[in-house]
Each structure stands twice: as structure tokens, then as C-alpha cells.
């Protein structure tokens, strides 16, 4: 086997391990908080195979209820079909759905346009970017290993989005700066901070009580978004007051400091003079 072919096979297997198909129930549990955002909008799901994607399923079956304008879905093409499951196609395609046409209020095969792409359907490709430009809101589960690059593209094209990522992404410099600048925030999240995803390439180490056949349990996953939600406006009940003697307090310029416990988030920070008045 040549070095080039060997690398392609390794990359293909690696790409397969980066695919986590999301449960319909998890999508529904999160999306119920965002319904007001979707009326008259074009939704783009660009990292889930539209032929098996629960994102496409959710939006197509709720198209009229949400008042969508258009639904588009694309996915990355198999580079070597023999390495992949029957869910993968040798050619990359995108699906376009413009709503119910025959009065059944359910998406049917003849109502969904299937268009073959010239390229591989990668979200970074020129074809995918042209589809992205049409979109108002992007909703999907992007590859965790490409999360920084994926979010960067959404910000570059000024798109609204609701996507799944690992909580470790918060520590990435690029993502942290977006959170700090109030350009991205966390959604409502998965129950218990863990999600079950369809992926046969990993062994499932979940406990017997938390095990689901054909799925892998992934801890620390979360929804990331720039869509406004009620959760962002909930008041935190704070009690702790800090003094300069206790530790360095944040300045008006937003200097951060360490808080060891959730309950120790500062109600306020006082100068020596201000503290003496309490």
C-alpha cells in the first residue's frame, strides 16, 4: 500500500470517528426554547447526512409549525465508500425542502429536491459556502476536531447558529474571546451534561443504567449559540462580597479573578472604604 493511500485510509477512519449523529429527542428538547427565532428563516444543516440526519428530520417535520422559509442540508462525502456504513453515499448531495405541497403536512420524497454536489460537501468548500450565504440560521452537530474553524466561519459570514460542541471548547482562545465579547453563549444543554450519539466506531463505556444500544455516551457536550434565549436573562442570586485583602477584585476594565465555588461568585467588590460601611 502506498504512503498516500495509507494516509487517505487513516484520514477516512479518523473522519468516521468524528461523526456523532444526534438523537431526535435531544434536538427537540433544545429547539423548543428557540421557536420564535425561526419564522420566515432559511435553516442550513451542513454537517449531518441529510438522508439520515435527525436535524433534517426535525426541521422538515416541523417546517410549517416553525414557519420556515426553506431547509437545506448537506454532508461530507465518503472518500472511500468501502470504509463506511451503508448510510454514506459515494457522492455528496444536498437536500432542499420548501415545505408541504400536497396537504399532508409531512415531508414526502417528491417534495424534497436532491441535488448532487460537484465537490465533497465539506463545509469549507466553495459550494457549501454559497449555500451558507443563503442561510439565516445554521443548526447542526459539527466535527468536534474542527470546532474552532467551524465557528470561525459562522462568525465570518455573520450567521445565527445553534450547534453542538464539547464544553472543552470554552477553553479555546478563539471561543473564549467570543464568549467574553458576548458573541456566543451556551444553550440550555443536555440532561446531566451528557448526550447519547449514534457512532459505531467507539466502544460505549456507559454504565448499565445509562447504556443505549448502538450509541455512545459523551460527557461534557453542550449547545453553543448566538440566538437570544430566556436563560441569558435569568438573574443569579449572589451573596459574596470581596475585598482587596481577600484577593484581587475585577476592575472596571473587566479583569478576571478566580472563584473557587459557584456560591462565591461576587455580589460586588468593595474598596477598603466601601467595605467598612457594610
Region locations from a protein language model:
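Class I S-adenosyl-L-methionine-dependent methyltransferase catalytic core
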Residues: 1-278
